[in-house]
Regions:
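A glycine-centered beta->alpha junction motif in the catalytic cores
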Residues: 89-102, 153-156, 277-293
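ATP-binding pocket architecture of kinase catalytic cores
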Residues: 33-131
Length: 314
């Protein structure tokens, strides 16, 4: 499928190409070539994705001992290439290891990933400021009222498709919005840092129970650090699969993060609140119904995972 394209632009001889099943939005292929193992990626084209910035950022991270992707240059000396349809793509060296399933991390891997996240935040303080992630724009756009309107549209879409289970989830969320706490977040008091932007277990490569790499830095941005701390925990810890949160394990996770990262009292006070707010006002069900991506089912999995957490908390 890609033999001529990759040979002309990179001089690679492909023996085998396997479609990657993880990751939402992007179209990713694992390549076995005469020259080695590589990853061919057609990145998502959303507003939060910045594939043009990824090679430089990853080179900086590798210089500071963060196991990030190494990109190949094409025949013109650039990192970004186009196929015959005008789709942008990159080629990266492939790290050894596999991507674990959600909520399957051992405690050792869980704490190792927390420590690495703290190190990423510390290292990236020396990098130029990245685009805004969860910030003032997010809170202006993503309000409970707008979530309510989106959920009502998604209920209608679910019922049209006969998806009664998702319709029930959405109706529960509509009820939640009516009684949701009136939390306010002071961005000037939250610790915000340059970060991966989408740091969780689906972006890990692991071998022998340890991290070998963190992949997919296309959505790197500035986030409140507690959002990424909490999100990475709830997708990795086995206890969270049914929506439960082991507070003792979460405390150990935060402690491991703080080996390199820093959290204020205000951060800790809002650790749960900020994440719960974000998953309450973001309509992943709507993303699923609107998407045409081959792997759009991941949006539905994210939606149901978030709903279980909210149902357990509220």
């Amino acid at each position: 499928m890609f033999n001529d394209l990759l040979y002309r632009q990179y001089g690679l001889h492909i023996h085998h190409a396997q479609h990657a099943l993880t990751g939402a939005g992007s179209d990713t292929w694992l390549l076995t070539c005469t020259e080695g193992d590589y990853v061919l990626k057609f990145p998502a084209s959303g507003a939060i994705d910045h594939p043009e910035a990824e090679p430089k950022l990853c080179a900086f991270l590798r210089r500071h001992d963060i196991p990030a992707c190494a990109f190949l240059k094409n025949h013109t000396g650039g990192y970004l290439s186009l196929d015959s349809d005008g789709r942008m793509f990159t080629v990266q060296q492939r790290f050894p290891g596999h991507t674990p399933d959600w909520n399957s991390a051992s405690e050792a891997l869980l704490l190792e990933s927390a420590e690495l996240l703290g190190k990423i935040h510390a290292v990236l303080q020396a990098y130029p400021t990245l685009p805004e992630g969860i910030g003032a724009g997010f809170f202006a756009r993503m309000t409970p009222q707008r979530a309510l309107e989106s959920y009502r549209r998604s209920v209608a879409a679910a019922l049209r498709l006969g998806d009664t289970e998702s319709a029930a989830d959405l109706n529960w969320r509509i009820g939640l919005i009516a009684r949701f706490p009136t939390w306010q977040f002071d961005l000037n008091r939250l610790t915000c840092r340059n970060t991966h932007g989408d740091y969780f277990i689906s972006q890990f490569l692991c071998k022998d129970g340890h991290l070998t790499a963190v992949i997919d830095w296309t959505s790197a941005c500035v986030h409140p650090v507690i959002w990424e701390v909490m999100r990475s925990f709830v997708y990795a810890a086995p206890c969270c699969a049914d929506g439960s949160i082991d507070r003792s394990l979460l405390a150990r996770y935060v402690h491991a993060y703080c080996r390199y990262g820093t959290l204020s009292d205000y951060d800790l006070e809002n650790l749960d609140r900020l994440y719960f707010y974000q998953i309450a006002v973001c309509d992943y069900y709507g993303q699923y119904y609107a998407s045409t991506a081959a792997n759009r089912h991941i949006y539905l999995q994210q939606a149901k995972h978030a709903t279980r957490l909210l149902q357990s908390a509220f």
